[in-house]
Amino acid sequence: MKKEEMIQKAYEIAVERYAAVGVDTEKVLKTMQDFHLSLHCWQADDVTGFEVQAGALSGGIQATGNYPGKARNIDELRADILKAASYIPGTHRLNLHEIYGDFQGKVVDRDQVEPEHFKSWIEWGKEHNMKLDFNSTSFSHPKSGDLSLSNPDEGIRQFWIEHTKRCRAVAEEMGKAQGDPCIMNLWVHDGSKDITVNRMKYRALLKDSLDQIFATEYKNMKDCIESKVFGIGLESYTVGSNDFYIGYGASRNKMVTLDTGHFHPTESVADKVSSLLLYVPELMLHVSRPVRWDSDHVTIMDDPTMELFSEIVRCGALERVHYGLDYFDASINRIGAYVIGSRAAQKCMTRALLEPIAKLREYEANGQGFQRLALLEEEKALPWNAVWDMFCLKNNVPVGEDFIAEIEKYEAEVTSKR
């Protein structure tokens, strides 16, 4: 029996199994078609970027490993991203950091960046049906230090304020050109290695910096703000903590970013979704896999990621959440890393959408705890993978592990020769 026939037969069985618990698999497939990931450009080159005078990676983040074949320039990075996207079902976005501008070999300091430096990206995105998102970049620069937007040195603080203002202008042009808002994330590494006696001072400075940055209103971009529990070399204090950004986001009606690696390992990011959605307009996700710290391992279909996507579906918040990925593993094939992590996130969403939520809520409303728990457990064994396989088949991408050989071929013909 041909593989396509097996996929079709398995799907037909899944349709009946899910119908028995009140789930419409065709509706799930249609919803999945509108589920767009924002692929992070920095997996392709280990967060190096294209600045002429690029600094070493800093800001408490690390890309570990030295697998051969990383992208060395803008053309290679674009080619690798397109290759990865060809194995990911559906249409997706691309998330750029400011250091990935098309600087044409010129020295452009961070406070001098202009929309023109991303003109070729905008054109590329249109050509390949890939809308763009954006990030300001506070790390890997001579003025990064331990503090950027919260720096008491007014000259340095204003440098980063100007940088971030200009990044918002770039994001506005991206959104205008693509006819869809560009989501611009703001994360700064600011913090202290050892005990500080000025917590309030630095947070007041960050608050003032953000107010200056967000003073200009734009129609074609949306801001989101991201916290972190700590970074390497900044273990004792992080200015932009979770509490800080929740307060700022709620008081300023700003989108909050939840990076799954930016919390204590015992915290549930999924549990934060329902609370935040009561107070902020939208959420941005940076889906990663923290191993003991914010290690940015490749996303997999693990319990925390599954719980996160289930909670979004249960909250009825599909339209209020934006789905970005944020990991960078330099120890394995980078195109493979993109595909594994992206498809893992999509698998989690597929399973979340297939949950028999109506029946589960009926049990809960009736106080039928045994029945609710029993169905939650039995649902795990339902053939969600047959629905996922059909989604891949409908989108003309490899089903199952077939992409492995394709990526090996690209490595042999392209990346291994770099």
UniProtKB/Swiss-Prot annotation:
One GO biological process term: L-lyxose metabolic process
Cellular compartments annotated: Cytoplasm
Signal peptide from the UniProt entry: none
Enzyme Commission number(s) from the entry: 5.3.1.14
Recorded GO CC terms: cytoplasm
Residues holding Mn(2+): 262, 294, 296
Cofactor names: Mn(2+)
Reactions the enzyme catalyzes: L-rhamnopyranose = L-rhamnulose
Cofactor note: Binds 1 Mn(2+) ion per subunit.
Pathway named in the protein's UniProt entry: Carbohydrate degradation; L-rhamnose degradation; glycerone phosphate from L-rhamnose: step 1/3
GO molecular function ontology, one term from the record: L-rhamnose isomerase activity
Enzyme class: isomerase
Similarity annotation: Belongs to the rhamnose isomerase family.
Function: Catalyzes the interconversion of L-rhamnose and L-rhamnulose.
Name the UniProt record assigns to this protein: L-rhamnose isomerase
Organism: Bacteroides thetaiotaomicron (strain ATCC 29148 / DSM 2079 / JCM 5827 / CCUG 10774 / NCTC 10582 / VPI-5482 / E50)
The encoding gene: rhaA
